[in-house]
Swiss-Prot record:
Keyword annotations: Amino-acid biosynthesis, Cytoplasm, Histidine biosynthesis, Lyase
Example GO molecular function: imidazoleglycerol-phosphate dehydratase activity
Pathway: Amino-acid biosynthesis; L-histidine biosynthesis; L-histidine from 5-phospho-alpha-D-ribose 1-diphosphate: step 6/9
GO CC annotation, single: cytoplasm
Family statement drawn from the similarity comment of this UniProt entry: Belongs to the imidazoleglycerol-phosphate dehydratase family.
EC numbers, comma separated: 4.2.1.19
Broad EC category: lyase
Cystine pairs: none
Protein name as annotated: Imidazoleglycerol-phosphate dehydratase
Length: 192
């Protein structure tokens, strides 16, 4: 089974191309114009073992919203295409990741339905060059396209550490949920 995708999206605000290999080695080439977001996507790729190429150009002279939102939408679409009919996947997984004084927990269900519940304890308006509030919106955008459920929570005193712990917990839970365990659709309905 070839679990790869190559997707693109062009709007008046952004121009994005994404390549994804779910059965990769955690190799990445990320360029979004938002340095802290690049760092988060690199951590996601490395810890999920998903090979990821993201080339995004957006209207970051306005702010980071359109670029990060559209990367989330397209990343979700790339995931949905790569995962296919979900035959044999573990489907549900969770991970807890500490980073210094911070800790994050993320649980995922690749259910075919979209739901996002993320609670972060950010105290600053920005984390590096990325607005703090866009972190939740990135996950909402990803989930709406990927068609999965995600619950995440973080606590800590350092926003950088919290965000990084969240992206790593997301990566580790997704890595586990996409593992092939058998040859069946993991649902009593027979479809996801």
């Amino acid at each position: 089974m070839d679990r790869k995708s190559n997707v693109s999206r062009t709007t008046s605000e952004t121009d994005i191309q994404i390549e994804m290999n779910l059965d990769g080695k955690g190799k990445y080439n990320i360029s979004t114009g938002v340095n802290f977001f690049n760092h988060m996507l690199e951590a996601f790729s490395k810890h999920s073992m998903i090979d990821l190429v993201v080339d995004a150009k957006g209207d970051i002279e306005i702010d980071d919203h359109h670029t990060i939102e559209d990367v989330g939408i397209l990343l979700g679409e790339a995931f949905r295409q790569a995962i296919g009919d979900k035959r044999g996947i573990k489907r549900m997984a969770d991970a807890t990741v500490p980073m210094d004084e911070s800790v994050a927990k993320v649980a995922i269900d690749i259910s075919g339905r979209s739901y996002c519940n993320m609670e972060f304890d950010f105290t600053n308006e920005k984390i590096g060059d990325m607005t703090s509030e866009i972190v939740v919106h990135f996950f909402e955008s990803f989930v709406s396209s990927a068609k999965l459920n995600i619950y995440g929570v973080s606590k800590g005193a350092n926003d950088h550490h919290q965000a990084e712990a969240v992206f790593k917990a997301f990566a580790k839970s997704l890595k586990e949920a996409i593992k092939i365990e058998h040859d069946e659709i993991p649902s009593t309905k027979g479809v996801l």
